[in-house]
Amino acid sequence: ISNPGGYLTDIPAVAAVAERLGVPLIVDNTLATPYLCNPIAQGATLVVHSTTKYLTGNGTVMGGVVVDSGNFDWSASDKFPSLSAPEPAYHGLKFHETFGALAFTFHGIAIGLRDLGMTLNPQAAHYTLMGIETLSLRMQRHVKNAMKIATWLENDPRVDFVTYAGLPSSPYFERGKRLYPKGAGALFTFAVKGGYEACVKLVDNVEIFSHVANLGDTRSLIIHSASTTHRQLTPEQQEAAGAAANVVRLSIGTEDADDLIRDLDQALSAAVN
């Protein structure tokens, strides 16, 4: 699931191309989470997550994970010498020859961890494990809330369009039913009539939504990317990134959906004359 628009990737189709070219497919599954999508079952080689988002669920940690499917032959070509060729630092050891299906994982530990030092601190690991215990329950609420709010926004005359893939009007709707049957996530954008200034006013007037650049939180978050995270880009670049001047991004949380709708309603009234 893409950021910011929440578009749904056809992983099996991309996986087929990757297999034909002899390259690994790496999927960032942060926004879908393992609850909504299992990329390895759809053909991915590696899956990455920002654990700061839904896995922990409350924005209290910084972390990430890499999940290795173990289904890629790193020695099938000369494209991956770090895994198939002798490693001088380990007396000529060949990672794929020695560790087989776990070659990438052990290379990440023996080389990546050694050189870069990325280690999740124990407290962050504890919070993350606690978050994962409630992942399925939270994602059900995230998706339910997102669908209700996106439907309301789509029917509001102050809104030009909504990108939520769970809506029947979305070009990704059928793909979602096929590949993401549990839901299309909880991140999407919508365009506000009134453009840039109206979006800024909207964000300034919300009371329940938090104006934060993070996503995947139990708290509902809002941001106008064109005036914040994507401000340095040209209008053409913003448009290409899905962060045009008239677009606001929402990360829907687990609060009461009707409360969130009332908050957006009053903020839109303040923003759009």
Residue ranges and their predicted role:
Residues P24, L46, F161, L187, ...:
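Structural preference for beta-strand elements that scaffold enzyme active sites
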Residues S2, D10-I11, R138, D204, ...:
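PLP-dependent enzyme catalytic core of the Aspartate aminotransferase-like
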Residues N71-F72, S169, K193-G195, S227-T228, ...:
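Short, glycine-/Ser/Thr-/acidic-enriched flexible segments
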